[in-house]
């Protein structure tokens, strides 16, 4: 395919047009009075959203050179979303500001490489200053504030803070669609896996169709149990203790299952059998997790263990187990806390080294089940369009909250960027590097300007007053008042703020140092086929 090539100013200006188109579309959503953007979908109703990364991903421009500029900014939003889960609009605004100021200087004859070095030094100083002013987040109220600011809903803030309190920082919090119109929180404490009882005759509550086992023994094996004789010595030992039994096995079939059911119905023995969760290597890992949580041993050939030789000491224990037709929940396993902590540490290191998003997600689920539990926020809304928009907001809020717990918080509303201006201005640089520093100084003001503009205020006036205000004071764009940002609950996670700045500077620097752009030439339209004269009939 033939290529179209542009050089120097032509190349950069074409890319900048793309940057501006995308950034101008995204930045209208910034702040408490930001507007929505409507995205056409191939199927179904349009998506109405104020989520920066969702909007950025949808934008495709006809001009190849402009589209490359737009895609680079979209990459900033995506990268910020991957790292911090929020702050994508802020990152887009910062990118546009750095590119706009940088292009002016490059066009005037400044060296782009020197400018890039200055930008990198200024950003490193700004990030360091942001981290120094960070306030740790630990209590429920602070978590609720972070989530409320991100989602623009105090109710959502309460749900997320309650969920994090219940399941801990390592717990899994999932977002699902509710069948009703109300948004609600459902928390499952303990370890849950998606396997239910093998026979409905094993239930203890026939009205709710669940089996509740109090203080049970737990047999964990990756073998199939077909012959009751294999586990008969073990069953006789448990029978003497008068305690119930949960069997987690590859399967229970043959004559073993009806024998267990018959003893359950007769009241001889309270037993529930479920299939082991997962498949392949993941199943082995999950069975080992259950064993460590309950203080038991996995009966497996890998360890040279056989069912007929298993003793009561190899069984796990828990304070309660609840089994329904689809899932099993183990509450308060009797495992050694030190062994559980070691297992958690191993899974955390596996998460860090995992390259696949799917693997990371599954490891995160295992971590949550070992360390806390699972919380589900069920989102309700009047229409499907509203439901989609609300789900995106809650996902952003959840990510922002996790980021806040991880690295702390700073003043929100773009105030944190302005608060580090003095630290960046104090950086002693010369020549083009000083120009790079000055570009960052101007860009750091841009989020506040845009938030003020979206709320109907003059950005320059707000910036001037903010620079002369005492530390911690900022502009509440929602009310038009000047307040202490932290006390007013207008806060941003440090991780979100620094990621937005670092990613924006990285991609903007690449655009400024671009000297040639290569794009595919558009395919010429194929000519329409000539009409066959024989088909013209009596037209002549």
Curated annotation (Swiss-Prot):
NCBIfam families found in the cross-reference section: GroEL, PRK00013.1, PRK12849.1, PRK12850.1, PRK12851.1
Catalyses which reaction(s): ATP + H2O + a folded polypeptide = ADP + phosphate + an unfolded polypeptide
Listed SUPFAM superfamilies: GroEL apical domain-like, GroEL equatorial domain-like, GroEL-intermediate domain like
A Pfam family the protein falls into: Cpn60_TCP1
Superkingdom assignment: Bacteria
UniProt protein name: Chaperonin GroEL
Species in which this protein is naturally found: Streptococcus gordonii
Keywords noted in UniProt: ATP-binding, Chaperone, Cytoplasm, Isomerase, Nucleotide-binding
EC number of this enzyme: 5.6.1.7
GO cellular component: cytoplasm
């Amino acid at each position: 395919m033939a290529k179209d090539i542009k050089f120097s100013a032509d190349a950069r200006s074409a890319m900048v047009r793309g940057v501006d188109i995308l950034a101008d579309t995204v930045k209208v959503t910034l702040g408490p009075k930001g507007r929505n953007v409507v995205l056409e979908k191939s199927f179904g109703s349009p998506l109405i959203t104020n989520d920066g990364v969702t909007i950025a991903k949808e934008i495709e421009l006809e001009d190849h050179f402009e589209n490359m500029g737009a895609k680079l900014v979209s990459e900033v939003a995506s990268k910020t979303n991957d790292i911090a889960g929020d702050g994508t609009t802020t990152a887009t605004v910062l990118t546009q500001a750095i590119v706009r100021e940088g292009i002016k200087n490059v066009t005037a004859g400044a060296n782009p490489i020197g400018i890039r070095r200055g930008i990198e030094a200024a950003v490193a100083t700004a990030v360091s200053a942001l981290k120094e002013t960070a306030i740790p987040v630990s209590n429920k109220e602070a978590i609720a504030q972070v989530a409320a600011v991100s989602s623009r809903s105090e109710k959502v803030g309460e749900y997320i803070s309650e969920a994090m309190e219940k399941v801990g920082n390592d717990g899994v919090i999932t977002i699902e669609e509710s069948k009703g119109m109300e948004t609600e929180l459902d928390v499952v404490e303990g370890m849950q896996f998606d396997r239910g009882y093998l026979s409905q005759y094993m239930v203890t509550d026939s009205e709710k169709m669940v089996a509740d086992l109090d203080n049970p023994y737990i047999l964990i094996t990756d073998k199939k149990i077909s012959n009751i004789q294999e586990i008969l010595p073990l069953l006789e030992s448990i029978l003497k203790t008068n305690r119930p039994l949960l069997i987690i096995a590859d399967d229970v079939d043959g004559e073993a299952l009806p024998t267990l059911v018959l003893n359950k119905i007769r009241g001889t023995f309270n037993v529930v059998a479920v299939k082991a969760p997962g498949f392949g290597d993941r199943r082995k890992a999950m069975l080992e997790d259950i064993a460590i949580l309950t203080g038991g041993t996995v009966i497996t050939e890998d360890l040279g263990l056989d069912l007929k030789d298993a003793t009561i000491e190899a069984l796990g224990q828990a304070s309660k187990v609840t089994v329904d037709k689809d899932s099993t929940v183990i509450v308060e396993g009797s495992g050694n806390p030190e062994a559980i902590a070691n297992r958690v540490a191993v899974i955390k290191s596996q998460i860090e080294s995992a390259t696949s998003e799917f693997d990371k997600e599954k490891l995160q689920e295992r971590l949550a089940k070992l360390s806390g539990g699972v919380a589900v926020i069920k989102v309700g809304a009047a229409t499907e369009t509203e439901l989609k928009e609300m789900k995106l907001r809650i996902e952003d809020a959840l990510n922002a909250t996790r980021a806040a717990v991880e690295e702390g918080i700073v003043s929100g509303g773009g105030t944190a960027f302005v608060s580090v201006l003095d630290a960046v201005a104090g950086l002693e640089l010369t020549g083009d590097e000083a120009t790079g520093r000055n570009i960052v100084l101007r860009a750091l003001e841009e989020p506040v300007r845009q938030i003020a503009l979206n709320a109907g205020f003059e950005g320059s006036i707000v910036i001037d007053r903010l620079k002369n205000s005492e530390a911690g004071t900022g502009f509440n764009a929602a009310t038009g008042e000047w307040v202490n940002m932290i006390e007013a609950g207008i806060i941003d996670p440090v991780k979100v703020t620094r990621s937005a700045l670092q990613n924006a500077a990285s991609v903007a620097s690449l655009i400024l140092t671009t000297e040639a752009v290569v794009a595919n030439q558009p395919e010429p339209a194929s000519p329409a086929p000539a009409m066959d004269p024989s088909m013209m009939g009596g037209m002549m």
